[in-house]
């Protein structure tokens, strides 16, 4: 059975033994956790990651001394969310004195520290040695980036990450670096003899010790970053999804990968959830009885049209709730005993501007039952 098949199967599991939710259905515990330094927010594209990460950052600003919201998503939606332009330098968000935002590019940079000593030999040989490690250039850039972030003096950093596939690649970089740099270190003695021989025949000055000092530094840095990732007291991941198949599927894939990499994850935010409406359903037969009592033909036609449209809207609403309930049930059965599952309502308009983000952030603190649709029949 393929990984995709096994994941698909896991999404159809139902638990007959499921009783009460043991975990709160809000993010209060996450926000009150004073030991966390890094909070990653991720999921499929278009599920509300940026809105969720911005809201978490706003709430943390009420509880922590200094907060940085850091976007690693190439789309950089944080500027649009706050209606404020951000750059690759921390910028204070309007109306705050302790909440900053920056938008960075995690792709390869010419400034990565692995551009060690400019020698023709080094520049030609080292890339050849690393060809067996695809993505190493991005990994090196990521290591430099994470080391810089680690040295920043913020109480907590909230990462608004790119869609799932890109995020999983980033999370794999520390292990990739560990393998690649370990490979170079293991070649030290062989390289030393080769370089000394080359030096005796050429005028190239190859500072081997300086090169390996840099390699050892990068290796120590990657180990430190991986250690930070795997420390549940310092780092956690918040998964964001919507109650649709592809989103739930990617959430399961993300959680499995996080588990393999020993990265803490115990919060799931489910956005765009249609909650029950506090209004009576349309009783068509009752309406038809009322219709017969109306003598005015125009009023009768208008009333009939209104009843029909109302019934159509109700059918759409019920269909939507039934479809969402299928995936909400799967989310509840798969994660209800181990995760804080927070259902956020489908809203009338997009979340933009500080006021709307603040209002949305308050809803992250409210406990709400997972709204599974149950027909009265």
Swiss-Prot record:
It holds the Pfam family ArsA_ATPase. One of its GO terms (cellular component) is GET complex. Its main location: cytoplasm. It is found in: Cytoplasm; Endoplasmic reticulum. The active site is at residue 73. Coiled coil: none annotated. InterPro entries: Anion-transp_ATPase-like_dom, ATPase_ArsA/GET3, ATPase_ArsA/GET3_euk, P-loop_NTPase. Gene3D superfamilies: P-loop containing nucleotide triphosphate hydrolases. One of its GO terms (biological process) is tail-anchored membrane protein insertion into ER membrane. Its EC number is 3.6.-.-. It comes from the Eukaryota. Keywords: ATP-binding, Cytoplasm, Endoplasmic reticulum, Hydrolase, Nucleotide-binding, Transport. ATP binds at residues 44-51, 244, 271. ATPase required for the post-translational delivery of tail-anchored (TA) proteins to the endoplasmic reticulum. Recognizes and selectively binds the transmembrane domain of TA proteins in the cytosol. This complex then targets to the endoplasmic reticulum by membrane-bound receptors, where the tail-anchored protein is released for insertion. This process is regulated by ATP binding and hydrolysis. ATP binding drives the homodimer towards the closed dimer state, facilitating recognition of newly synthesized TA membrane proteins. ATP hydrolysis is required for insertion. Homodimer. Belongs to the arsA ATPase family. PANTHER family: ARSENICAL PUMP-DRIVING ATPASE ARSENITE-TRANSLOCATING ATPASE, ATPASE GET3. This is ATPase ASNA1 homolog. It comes from Plasmodium knowlesi (strain H). The lineage of its organism: Eukaryota, Sar, Alveolata, Apicomplexa, Aconoidasida.
